[in-house]
């Protein structure tokens, strides 16, 4: 018998309510009785004496049976003056709380209510808070990862921006202005390149001419015409290259004014056309308006193909064609349009110049290889009749000339000059380059802003976690207290046998 008293009673928490109902510790209709009790508690707490402990019991927690017992004990002290000789209290406060306790003890309603609170906390409230805290921790990790990605991305885009600016030869403070300034300096850079070519290409051209003339018996004027011209006259204008005479006047195009000038011309021609059409329309109205004579054109002229609005339209078209033709023509000795550009500025002549440089560079590179090899009897006999300039060439001289040519080709084909040439050929290209570079900087700024947003969201998630953790700790404490109260109450009903509520995981 004693061994039986020490056998514990194990109850699954999820089935605690069913266990109490099955063993008739409480009624099936306990929920309706609990609702009545809650209404009476809500009414009773409206009239309570001033007590710090009572206020603490009533603030922020679910009031259950054991709270009511404690409140009743406190009221016995505050309402002692209302106690009569029979040991009863005339105070309405005492009567209200005594009634609440009596309702709780009816059919053990307090026990099933406590069990319901325990099951709800274990199955729903505690897992929900833990899930929210885990979500906050996950968000913090995700926001931290995104913060690092945004920081790295912003630094990379900023580095790409400055690297691209370095390739263009600008600092990036004012992209458009710096590019236009470089384009303005482009003629002087090309003039220096032309001067360097003029000074350094003489011997190389002579060697190539002599070699072609010796091997192919080709006329010297057919060899590298552009390089020969630059070697004699430098980086002159296209007009001088095309005509052979130096222009008396050079009218260079203005880069910045070109798009605005085109837009203004288009607007002017549009206004002229509108005026012409409006005048023709006015004349047509005057001709139809009851024969009114405006003193400008006779009414009969409106039917003549050479008069009124039709004549004005033809004149407008003829005038437009005349102006366009005048824009493409230039007087004798005046370099205008592409003719006003230098050989290295104009695309076609610059490409020809580069082609001839590469042709000369390939020839000299091959010649340097031949000079580095041991000469056989056949080659020696062949070059006995060659010009003196060919016989006097050495490997060192040839390699030096190749190095000079490679340097010139590298300058003219550099990425910076390529973009400047494109801007020179199409002024709108500077806007495209500016937009391209600014886009990298904007992306860097957007990533920096996104990084700040990730920091803010990470802080918000941290604050939310800090607010949830005390709630979870308090709920765990209250749930453990409920578990102990329920286990102790059930143990009393079974002669003090130990009771274990299983599955709480607290």
Curated annotation (Swiss-Prot):
GO cellular component, one term: centrosome
Modified how: May be phosphorylated by CDK5. Ubiquitinated. Probably triggers proteasomal degradation and is negatively regulated by UFL1.
Residue segments, region RPL10a-binding domain (RBD): 355-370
Chain residue numbers at which the record places covalent cross-link Glycyl lysine isopeptide (Lys-Gly) (interchain with G-Cter in SUMO2): 450
Swiss-Prot/TrEMBL domain comment: The shuffled ATG8-binding motifs mediate interaction with both ATG8 family protein and UFM1.
Function, in words: Substrate adapter of E3 ligase complexes mediating ufmylation, the covalent attachment of the ubiquitin-like modifier UFM1 to substrate proteins, and which is involved in various processes, such as ribosome recycling and reticulophagy (also called ER-phagy). As part of the UREL complex, plays a key role in ribosome recycling by promoting mono-ufmylation of RPL26/uL24 subunit of the 60S ribosome.
The protein's name: CDK5 regulatory subunit-associated protein 3
């Amino acid at each position: 018998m004693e061994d039986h008293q020490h056998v514990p009673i194990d109850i699954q928490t999820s089935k605690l309510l069913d266990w109490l109902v099955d063993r008739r510790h409480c009624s099936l209709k306990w929920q309706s009785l609990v609702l009545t009790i809650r209404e009476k508690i809500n009414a009773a707490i409206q009239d309570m004496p001033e007590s710090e402990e009572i206020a603490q019991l009533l603030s922020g927690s679910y009031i259950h049976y054991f709270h009511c017992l404690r409140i009743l004990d406190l009221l016995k002290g505050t309402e002692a003056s209302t106690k009569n000789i029979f040991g009863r209290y005339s105070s309405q406060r005492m009567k209200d709380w005594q009634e609440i306790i009596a309702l709780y003890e009816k059919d053990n309603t307090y026990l099933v209510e406590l069990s319901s609170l325990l099951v709800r906390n274990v199955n729903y409230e505690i897992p929900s808070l833990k899930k929210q805290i885990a979500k906050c921790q996950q968000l913090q990790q995700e926001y931290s990862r995104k913060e690092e990605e945004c920081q790295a991305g912003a630094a990379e885009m900023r580095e790409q921006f400055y690297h691209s600016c370095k390739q263009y030869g600008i600092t990036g403070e004012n992209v458009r202005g710096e590019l236009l300034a470089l384009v303005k300096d482009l003629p002087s850079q090309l003039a220096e390149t032309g001067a360097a070519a003029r000074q350094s290409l003489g011997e190389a051209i002579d060697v190539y001419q002599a070699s072609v003339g010796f091997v192919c018996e080709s006329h010297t004027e057919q060899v590298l015409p552009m390089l020969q011209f630059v070697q004699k006259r430098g980086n002159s204008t296209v007009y001088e290259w095309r005509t052979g005479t130096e222009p008396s006047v050079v009218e260079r195009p203005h880069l910045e004014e070109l798009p605005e000038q085109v837009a203004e011309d288009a607007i002017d021609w549009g206004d002229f056309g509108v005026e012409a059409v409006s005048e023709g329309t006015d004349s047509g109205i005057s001709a139809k308006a009851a024969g009114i004579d405006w003193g400008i054109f006779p009414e009969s002229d409106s039917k003549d193909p050479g008069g009124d609005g039709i004549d004005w339209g033809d004149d407008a078209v003829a005038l437009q064609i005349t102006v366009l033709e005048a824009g493409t023509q230039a007087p004798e000795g005046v370099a205008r349009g592409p003719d006003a550009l230098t050989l290295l500025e104009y695309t076609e002549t610059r490409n020809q110049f580069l082609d001839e440089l590469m042709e000369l560079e390939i020839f000299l590179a091959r010649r340097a290889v031949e000079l580095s090899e041991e000469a056989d009897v056949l080659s020696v006999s062949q070059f006995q009749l060659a010009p003196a300039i060919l016989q006097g060439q050495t490997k060192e001289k040839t390699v030096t000339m190749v190095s000079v040519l490679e340097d010139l080709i590298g300058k003219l084909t550099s990425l910076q000059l390529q973009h400047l040439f494109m801007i020179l050929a199409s002024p709108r290209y500077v806007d495209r380059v500016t937009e391209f570079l600014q886009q990298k900087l904007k992306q860097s700024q957007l990533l920096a802003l996104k990084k700040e947003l990730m920091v803010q969201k990470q802080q918000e998630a941290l604050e939310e976690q800090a607010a949830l953790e005390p709630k979870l700790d308090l709920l765990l404490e209250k749930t453990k207290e409920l578990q102990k109260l329920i286990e102790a109450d059930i143990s009393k009903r079974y002669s003090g046998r130990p009771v274990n509520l299983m599955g709480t995981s607290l």
